[in-house]
Amino acid sequence: MSKIFILSAGTSPDSYNNQLAKHLSNYFDKKGLENVLFDNLYSDIPFLLDTHDDVPEKILEMRKSLEVSEKIIIFSPVYNGGFLAHLKNTLDWLSLAYDENRYSALFKEKKVAVVTTVKGAGGNAQKAFEILSMQLSNYDLQVFEKFHLITKSEHQNEKSILNNRDVIESLNSLSLIHI
């Protein structure tokens, strides 16, 4: 089985999205599912201003992992009905052509699921998912049609993830896990 690439766009090391991504990564480890988690996307990845800029080391590490991954899970917070700039910046860096690879080669036909955690009720989450989903499709990713909104009370620990039927259903549909 290929590696599962987990990308968390949380706003701090202790953000809800990063916490949940770490819980899921630990769960996959226990199940023997090879995965890699990248978070803190706001750190060590400068904004892409010119496609001729030197590629950040963190992006080079992500490329290596994406090359051997077929499935991606993105944890994305919602702000003002959209997703954060550091997530798009990271995706833009990863979409650049390199070596013999063309634009978006790392993403081509890979399956991606989106999970969103919020402090409140998540009223803007659906619109944010639609915007992010459209962007992910532009990168040639196969976006799972259903996104997952997890409120603060639902993601305090690994057990909470396993009790969230929608998340488990999507992960099963992506053939990531079978519970």
Predicted regions and their residues:
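Short helix/strand-capping connector loops at secondary-structure junctions
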Residues: 148-159
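Flexible, gly/pro- and Lys/Arg-enriched active-site loops
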Residues: 96-108
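Residue-level detector of flexible, active-site-proximal loop/helix-junction positions
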Residues: 42-44, 119, 150
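Short, histidine-centered active-site or binding-site loop motifs used for metal coordination
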Residues: 8-10, 116-118, 153-154
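N-terminal beta1-alpha1-beta2 submodule of the flavodoxin-like/Rossmannoid cofactor-binding fold
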Residues: 1-99, 143, 158-177
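Short, glycine-/small-residue-rich phosphate/pyrophosphate-handling segment
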Residues: 107-148
